[in-house]
From Swiss-Prot:
Residues 126-447 are stromal. Involved in protein precursor import into chloroplasts. Part of the motor complex consisting of a co-chaperone (TIC40) and a chaperone (HSP93) associated with the import channel (TIC110). Causes the release of bound transit peptides from TIC110 and stimulates ATP hydrolysis by HSP93. Involved in reinsertion of proteins from the chloroplast stroma into the inner membrane. Residues 310-344, 386-425 form the STI1 domain. Keywords: Chloroplast, Membrane, Plastid, Plastid inner membrane, Protein transport, Repeat, Transit peptide, Transmembrane, Transmembrane helix, Transport. Residues 77-104 are chloroplast intermembrane. It comes from Arabidopsis thaliana. Its main location: plastid. This is Protein TIC 40, chloroplastic. The C-terminal half (89-105) of the Ser/Pro-rich region and the transmembrane domain are necessary and sufficient for membrane integration. The TPR region (238-373) interacts with TIC110. Residues 148-160, 172-186 have a biased composition (Low complexity). Changing N405A: Loss of stimulation of HSP93 ATP hydrolysis. Expressed in seedlings, flowers, leaves, stems and roots.
Amino acid sequence: MENLTLVSCSASSPKLLIGCNFTSSLKNPTGFSRRTPNIVLRCSKISASAQSQSPSSRPENTGEIVVVKQRSKAFASIFSSSRDQQTTSVASPSVPVPPPSSSTIGSPLFWIGVGVGLSALFSYVTSNLKKYAMQTAMKTMMNQMNTQNSQFNNSGFPSGSPFPFPFPPQTSPASSPFQSQSQSSGATVDVTATKVETPPSTKPKPTPAKDIEVDKPSVVLEASKEKKEEKNYAFEDISPEETTKESPFSNYAEVSETNSPKETRLFEDVLQNGAGPANGATASEVFQSLGGGKGGPGLSVEALEKMMEDPTVQKMVYPYLPEEMRNPETFKWMLKNPQYRQQLQDMLNNMSGSGEWDKRMTDTLKNFDLNSPEVKQQFNQIGLTPEEVISKIMENPDVAMAFQNPRVQAALMECSENPMNIMKYQNDKEVMDVFNKISQLFPGMTG
């Protein structure tokens, strides 16, 4: 701001005048020359004093007042002079500096952190949606298989039999055709073996014929009985203990359950017990790694549900979901499950912590509206859109993983307040690698 400058001089010292021309007398200053305006001092406050010369060399006239006015709207000062000393003072009205508006949340680095938080949240929701859909599909398929298997379970065959059809009804044992042939052949042998002779007496001798008739059929009957017993043994080798009452697809279910990692069984345990398992990754660890604690209430499920209804958020998240899940009704269907809703609420509660970073992040996410003018203004200042920030971070998970480092979080917090604080981390390789990665992802970001 251009201020007023007062320049004073006496009649005996005309060289002190700046920008003045004298014609006949030193007492009458003429108009100022505007050709050299840069000579005039532009200071807010100037105080100058000069020792008076000897009374003999000074005329008895009073000091003159010279006011140099430069294009300013408002201020003038009064100049007084005496024989002993001269004083010139210039003052300018103090202009109050407006405080920074509360809507200015932070620098672009802070919005990068907001993008990391949103991407971590959406990634967790996406992974759980996939697991939940897979578990639901498996349960539906197994229920259909059990229903189909129950249709074959009738009284015609035992429930544990691996054969889908009952055995044919067993008839009463009948004589073998070989046995009848042998019997008939035995009778023929008996007849032909004996010679009919004229008996010398009235009583014939039936003893040899009776022995042949009794002995030979008994041998044939025993051989056929052994063959029959051997055939029966062939069907009785399978013990009933080896057959189980499970369905034919039970082995497949056991193999799939054995080979599945812990992460795939995480959500099934949540559905059954209503809480995450003690071992393995839980929902809260995602945001605890970002520095979150259990300081207070964080983002609510209702706010998340409202955020997922935003078309802009859907545009950012849906490309990373399977094709069958790119539907807003899917999220509503998921959130109807009380166990899944409670798990999400526990995870969101852990987002609020004791650090300043966590408080700012939580407060920002609570009232985060991509369509609000303040958010648009912030992203316009850094030359990026919310879609670009979040999509680039979700495409590069290394950046989100790097934000789990507490030193990176502290550096991001300090540099968001004052960009010159980055000089403190010039020798920290981890922090500088993260900043270099951010500068590569967002080349238009400054500050």
